[in-house]
Amino acid sequence: MNDLTRYFTKIALAFLSAMVLFSGCKQDEKKPVAGSEMFVLTKENLQDKIKGGWAGQTIGVVYGAPVEFKYQGSLIPDEQNIPWREGYVKYWWDKKPGLFDDVYTDLNFVAAFENYGLDISQEKIAEHWANTAYHLAHANQASRYNILNGIMPPASGFWKNNPHADDLDFQIEADFIGLMTPGMVNQATEIADRVGHIMNSGDGWYGGVFVSALYSLAFVKNNPIELVETALQTIPEGTKFHNCIADVVKWHQQYPNDWKTAWFELQKKWNFDVGCPKGCFLSFNIDAKINSAYVALGLLYGNGDFTRSVNIAARCGQDADCNPATVGGVLGVMNGYSSIPAFWLNPLKEIEPLNFENTSMSLSKAYEISYRHALQMLEKAGGKIDENQVEIPYQSPVAVAFEQNFEKTFPVYRDRFDRSFTSELSYDFTGNGYIFYGNLVKCAKIDKDYIDRVSKRVGSEVFGLAEPDDPYIAVLDVYIDGTLDETVNLPMKNTSRRLEPHWKYQLTEGNHNVTLKWKNPDPA
């Protein structure tokens, strides 16, 4: 008893749920050059559009801040006010720097391309990415753990190595790609291949491909309907992602004045997450398909109006800051920075010169760097750059490779067993796979009963995120049906952590046992 008491003042491992899976069977005038596939923009307009992309994205993030994941599987009613006012961007900048994660992760990649050149290798991008100092979650953190432990891309984003592979992580950080490839959508998808497979694959990768295409094409298209339909051509037909967005286009045609009916159709058919253990069989849904569909809804029903489009995307719920951010960014490109209403733009200007958390990048710097990268990409693609204008070599979209995660694999039940353990945990299940969802929790300064109460109510993740520098690494031996399958490391340090202690897919169908044995429970 004394040993156990002494131990509990140090560390405990909380496994909250196991999910078992088995297989079943200012609108700018873009002038085409006569007789060619070139579009002309003045340099001033090009830079205005790039600025509009970054500004619109950041505005959307802040607008959705108070409702981010507050409405899961439900619309945000019109009666629920979403505030915006002078000083509001700076308020959130000071209150919650992590809110801007989809902007500063974007900027991290901008910095990588700036430091190492436009031909930077996937491996170099991954190394740069994995050694960032800020908090990450879902597919981003899973890939960072993989890379730090020797699993390099594309394996780092592959679903068997990353249960979050279909999550929207790449979708919310692909904006920069379209901004550096104006009108050159196939160059955008090539960069998306290099970057997006670091953290995602399948539908999760397609989310970023789709977003980068939207941004790229917004430089040369003024019609949101044409924009969405053309960007969708980058996604292979027959994939779930393509089918989902195609449904949104279809429902917009059926209900052209009723976005809420289209939203309900979307919920009925597509609101089901098969991969992310935080969302399976729960209302939380961070899957790239449905969140990209909310982006499409905002663009299609917003009719190019910044305020209406951003508002619709936010009121779809779920990731209600990132989705309006994408919509705001795309329309910022289409119409330009100078066309964003002052109501939205003035509060943003207060933070434009400030560096984002854990970066040396500000919006003001991003405006200049992305403009420079766009000019360099234009030169590489055979575009023409004159003193006052550029000729953009417009590209018809070519679909990227076919990928589909979790084929013939889907969740069948979620078993919540609130339990902490200090040495060994054993679990029996029927199926062909499982995933444990829980966190390593340090008890040195927190009463264990309090940890148990909070974990049972809201999960243990809040405790798992609280250790920015703890060097302790738990070591687990994982036995499947009595045979050692893997030894895994679970770092306490936030930026090094493994999100899920263990998972396994595509076992032989039947009855199985998984046992976790903690090899070093007392780090002192």
Specify the residue positions occupied by each region the protein language model found.
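Accessory "access/gating" subregions that flank catalytic or transport cores
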Residues: 41, 147, 156-165, 176-184, ...
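Active-site-surrounding "flap" and adjacent substrate/cofactor-binding loops of secreted or lumenal enzymes
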Residues: 66-97, 103-106, 123-137
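Bacterial N-terminal signal peptides that target proteins for export
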Residues: 2-12
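Catalytic phosphate/nucleotide-handling subdomain of diverse soluble enzymes
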Residues: 59, 63, 70, 74-83, ...
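Active-site cavity-forming subdomains of large catalytic enzyme subunits
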Residues: 47, 51, 55, 59, ...
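Beta-strand-rich ligand-recognition modules
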Residues: 457-524
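Glycan-recognition and processing domains
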Residues: 387-473
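C-terminal motif of bacterial Sec signal peptides marking the signal peptidase cleavage site
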Residues: 22-24
